[in-house]
Design a protein with these regions (language model features):
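Structural signature of hydrophobic alpha-helical transmembrane segments
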Residues: 35-49, 91-108, 158-170, 223-233
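Helix-helix packing/entry segments at the starts of transmembrane helices
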Residues: 40-42, 82, 86, 100-107, ...
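Hydrophobic transmembrane alpha-helices of multi-pass small-molecule transport proteins
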Residues: 51, 107, 123-148, 260, ...
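Hydrophobic residues within alpha-helical transmembrane segments
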Residues: 11, 15, 41-46, 72, ...
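Helix-capping/transition residues at the boundaries of transmembrane alpha-helices
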Residues: 31-32, 93, 120, 183, ...
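Transmembrane alpha-helices of multi-pass small-molecule transport proteins
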Residues: 31-84, 109-115, 170-178, 192-212, ...
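Membrane-interface interhelical linkers
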Residues: 1-15, 49-77, 120-129, 146-160, ...
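Specific transmembrane alpha-helical segments of multi-pass solute transporters/efflux pumps
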Residues: 19, 23-24, 52-105, 140, ...
Length: 311
């Protein structure tokens, strides 16, 4: 890797860490006065249209044509990963502190590794130890009565909403497991475009069922609009574009570090911006989760590289 590429990779990693680590703050600002599900739906409408136009101009409109199987698979993955994963997050961040939410989501590589056992892809001893420790860390974070809900959450059960975030995270992990086994577009940006479109439709329907109002979205505060625009531009467009570039130009072990760097960014911002309190169980459980994820990501990435070299 040349020095110029190394510099670009380092800058891109920094952008990805900031873009995705700060999305939790963006969501928190957005849902202050915007309906959670509709705001996420319209976020993906805007982002998918922008990506569609960008890809069409850069690579030609023919590159956006999909087979029926590719179209169905991309939309299904969008509903499962973005719709369920970020839809539940938008609902839950009304109650669950941002730092706690990010630490629960950080465990995604652990769930993905567990799903792969269904495909007779047995984890190594190191992975198994990391997975076990990660599950213990999640359990410590989610101990009932140990996490203080956000001030404006009313009397809602914070533990219940942590489990809802966990459900969304499991859906995202299941999608990550299924994606390589499905017929999807080869261009990751094209795949992201159709995933966002599928998620937008599902979240809009869910928002209507949840009796959310489009007028509430339009009449939101300046801060909520700022958060929403940030999610569209930085979280979706810049984040995904940088991520796909890194996948093509950097080792997967390096790219995968976002899984345990992002929650550190989110926890720090939660303390600075929202004065969130880190209890002992959050500190201990969070530390265990981040270390466990680092182990699992490193081991699984090394296994993938050795398999690709063997082939």
């Amino acid at each position: 890797m040349s020095s110029s590429i190394k510099t670009k990779v380092a800058i891109s990693l920094g952008i990805m860490y900031v873009a995705w680590g700060t999305t939790y703050i963006g969501i928190a600002f957005t849902i202050e006065t915007m309906p959670p599900l509709l705001s996420m739906s319209f976020r993906f409408v805007a982002a998918s249209i922008a990506l569609f136009v960008f890809i069409g101009i850069r690579s030609g409109w023919a590159s956006l044509r999909l087979t029926r199987n590719e179209f169905v698979s991309a939309n299904f993955l969008g509903v499962l990963m973005l719709g369920m994963g970020l839809g539940t997050m938008a609902l839950a961040e009304k109650v669950v502190p941002i730092g706690v939410a990010s630490l629960i989501v950080a465990a995604m590589p652990i769930w993905t590794a567990l799903f792969r056992t269904l495909d007779k892809d047995r984890p190594t001893i190191s992975s198994l130890l990391g997975i076990t420790a990660g599950l213990i860390g999640i359990a410590i974070i989610m101990l009932p009565g140990q996490t203080i809900a956000r001030p404006d959450s009313g009397d809602q059960n914070v533990t219940l909403w942590m489990f809802i975030i966990l459900l969304g995270n499991l859906c995202w992990s299941l999608g990550s497991f299924l994606a390589p086994r499905m017929q999807t577009p080869s261009n990751p940006l094209v795949l992201s475009t159709y995933e966002m479109a599928g998620a937008a439709g599902a979240l809009f329907i869910a928002g209507m069922i949840n009796q959310e109002s489009i007028s509430d979205f339009m009449d939101a505060s300046v801060r909520s609009w700022g958060g929403w625009i940030y999610l569209v531009t930085v979280g979706s467009l810049i984040g995904y574009t940088v991520y796909t570039w890194l996948l093509e130009n950097a080792p997967i072990t390096l790219v995968s570090t976002y899984a345990y760097v992002n929650p550190v960014v989110a926890v720090a911002l939660g303390i600075v911006i929202f004065n969130e309190t880190l209890t002992t169980n959050i500190l201990l459980g969070g530390f265990i989760v981040i270390v466990s994820v680092a182990v699992v990501v490193a081991v699984e990435s090394a296994k993938k590289q050795s398999l690709s070299q063997a082939q």
